[in-house]
Amino acid sequence: RSLLGRKCRFDLWEPDRFEMNKAMPFEQAVQEYGKTTKLKRAYTYKALNRLIQASAADMTKKAMVDIYQSGRVPLIQIHDEVAISVKDRSDAENISRIMENAVPLEVPNKCDVEVGSCWGNAS
């Protein structure tokens, strides 16, 4: 599950040996490869990546809700970036704190702040 509980499942299995095998649901893999063949979950690297990406998306969405509830309106969100009109740098720093604390984590979450007259001039 992602940080906020979204399910990330890869329920495909393949033999635990180094050769090209077709990944399939567990029951079908047992029938195809036999009961004595050791099976492992297929595509675990994809499952881990999906879990990480889903958690990052959850954190960004939660931060956007918290920003909105603080009285500010996010203009646009792209991947893990949020563009917001602010009065000054201190307002941007407050938004940064909101984003960093949107989801409680054991490892601190850092948020970079860039301010400019337009998105292309932000630094």
Q: Which ranges hold each PLM region?
A:
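Conserved catalytic core of nucleotide polymerization and phosphodiester-bond processing enzymes
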Residues: 1-123
